[in-house]
Structure formats: structure tokens, C-alpha cells
């Protein structure tokens, strides 16, 4: 199986690249002509389209839409014309604050990309809050777990917002499952999460880190108070294997060994 992977230097893309026997990584900056030349020369059996602007607070409309939507269209069109499998990294950000529509530019860009991929017969995987080994380079876009795991005390938003934290191994397994079962899964979206909704307080209790609360006025506009993947929206036959307690333990061990 020959795989082309966009975002191959990133958190998820790098893991997928290591699993595929024959694969190429496609960088973040490319023209349509450069993209098509690379794909035509390599002739992949599948494209994992992971690369994106992942900054949920970015308000540069031209940049976000070019990166997350226009380039997705290029890839989806090439895969459609050449009858190549396409697995697209979507996001739970498309649910926004009211569970119906995105509440920021990032969410809208991912929804547009997802719709286009599905209409071309691809698979869209809506990732929830991914965490685990390998996200160190993401900086402010790394999970809250990584950003605070070495601190003695953290500041949290009030009202106990919740997240569906999903371990990186389960996200990788979801991509491989989608590939292996492509023909029966293609043409729609699926959620990739743990199926459990956890407060940030639960995270830091597991880590033994103290916390205090920010003022309610500091909660930004468009902030999702709750996210949760539903098992009915998972790929039939796929399920995550790493629960929160297990994932936190593994992640902490990994970071301790690196320091």
C-alpha cells in the first residue's frame, strides 16, 4: 500500500508516515501544480489528508480557507479523477457552541472541506481532543494536558467545561481502520473520540496538579463548553482502546522519560 500524507511532520501525520511501508510526505506549502506533480509521480493508493491550519483562533480568512478548504478541494478532485482512496482529518470544532454549526473560522473551514471530500466519495474523520506522545512541537495548539503537565498549579475556566479526550494511538487506529474498510465506509463522516466526557478537573486530579478558576468573563466567545463523540457516529466495528486514566499514565511516563 502506497500512502501520500499531508501534514506528515505533524502530530498525527508523523505517526501515520511511520506505519506505511511505502509513503511520501507532502509539505505544508505547495501549489496545485506541485501537488499534482508529486501525486502523479508517486501514484499512491491512498491519501491521508491531515495537513491544515489547526489554530482555532486564527481569523485570517484568506489563509485559513486557502489552507483548509481550497487545498482540500485540490486533493479531493485528484483522488476522485484517479479513483484513489481519500481519508480526511476533520474536527469536532464543526459542532460549535450550539452543536449545530461552527462558531469560528477554523470550524467552518473544516466543515467545508469535509463536505467536499464526502461529495467526492472520500471518508472524513471528525477528531475530538487528541492528546499523547508526539504533540510537543504544537506549541499553543498542543493539548491542555501537554501544556500544563509540568506545572504545580493551573488556571481553569469556571462551570466545568468537558472534553472528549482521545489518545493518539486510537486516532491512528481509526485511520488505518478506515483504510482497511474503505469500500463499505466511504462517502460519509465518522467521529473519532473516546466516548467519554471528562472535565479538566478530572485531568489534573489524575496528574496531582492543583487548580484554581479564572473569572467567567475570561471565557472567549465561541468557546465550546462540552464535546462528546457518540458511539452511533463511530465507524461500525471500530472502537477506542485507551481510556483517559490509561492514556494519562502512558503520556506522563513518556514525558518523564524524555525529560
Task: Describe these PLM feature segments.
Residues 9, 53-55, 91-99, 128-131:
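Active-site segment of SDR-like NAD(P)-dependent oxidoreductases
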Residues 3-20:
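N-terminal Rossmann NAD(P)H-binding glycine-rich loop of SDR-like oxidoreductase domains
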Residues 35-67, 93-97:
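NAD(P)H-binding glycine-rich loop region in Rossmannoid oxidoreductase-like domains
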Residues 21-39:
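Adenosine-cofactor binding site in Rossmann-like domains, unifying the SAM/SAH pocket
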Residues 63-74, 104, 108-109:
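Glycine-rich NAD(P)-binding loop of the Rossmann-fold in SDR/ketoreductase-type enzymes
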Residues 49, 73-105, 123:
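Conserved Rossmann-fold NAD(P)-dependent oxidoreductase catalytic core, especially the SDR/UDP-sugar
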Residues 103-107, 115-163, 168-172, 206-207:
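NAD(P)-dependent short-chain dehydrogenase/reductase
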Residues 7, 150-259:
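C-terminal substrate-binding subdomain of Rossmann-fold SDR/epimerase-dehydratase oxidoreductases
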Amino acid at each position: 500500500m502506497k500512502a501520500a500524507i499531508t501534514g506528515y511532520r505533524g502530530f498525527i501525520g508523523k505517526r501515520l508516515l511511520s506505519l506505511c511501508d511505502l509513503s511520501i510526505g507532502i509539505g505544508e506549502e505547495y501549489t496545485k501544480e506541485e501537488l499534482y506533480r508529486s501525486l502523479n509521480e508517486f501514484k499512491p493508493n491512498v491519501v491521508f489528508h491531515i495537513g491544515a491550519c489547526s489554530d482555532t483562533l486564527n481569523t485570517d480568512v484568506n489563509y485559513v480557507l486557502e489552507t483548509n478548504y481550497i487545498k482540500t478541494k485540490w486533493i479531493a478532485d485528484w483522488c476522485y479523477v484517479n479513483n484513489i482512496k481519500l481519508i480526511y482529518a476533520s474536527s469536532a470544532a464543526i459542532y460549535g457552541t450550539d452543536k449545530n454549526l461552527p462558531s469560528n473560522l477554523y470550524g467552518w473551514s473544516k466543515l467545508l472541506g469535509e463536505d467536499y471530500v464526502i461529495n467526492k466519495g472520500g471518508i472524513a474523520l471528525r477528531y475530538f481532543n487528541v492528546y499523547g506522545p508526539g504533540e510537543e512541537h504544537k506549541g499553543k495548539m498542543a493539548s491542555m494536558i501537554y501544556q500544563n503537565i509540568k506545572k504545580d498549579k493551573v488556571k481553569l475556566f469556571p462551570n466545568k467545561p468537558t472534553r472528549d479526550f482521545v489518545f493518539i494511538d486510537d486516532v491512528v487506529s481509526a485511520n488505518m481502520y478506515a483504510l482497511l474498510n474503505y469500500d463499505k465506509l466511504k462517502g460519509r463522516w465518522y467521529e473519532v473520540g473516546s466516548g467519554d466526557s471528562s472535565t479538566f478537573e478530572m485531568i489534573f486530579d489524575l496528574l496531582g496538579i492543583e487548580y484554581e478558576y479564572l473569572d467567567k468573563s475570561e471565557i472567549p466567545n465561541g468557546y465550546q463548553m462540552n464535546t462528546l463523540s457518540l458511539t452511533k457516529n463511530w465507524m461500525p466495528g471500530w472502537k477506542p482502546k485507551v481510556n483517559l486514566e490509561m492514556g494519562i499514565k502512558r503520556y506522563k511516563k513518556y514525558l518523564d522519560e524524555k525529560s
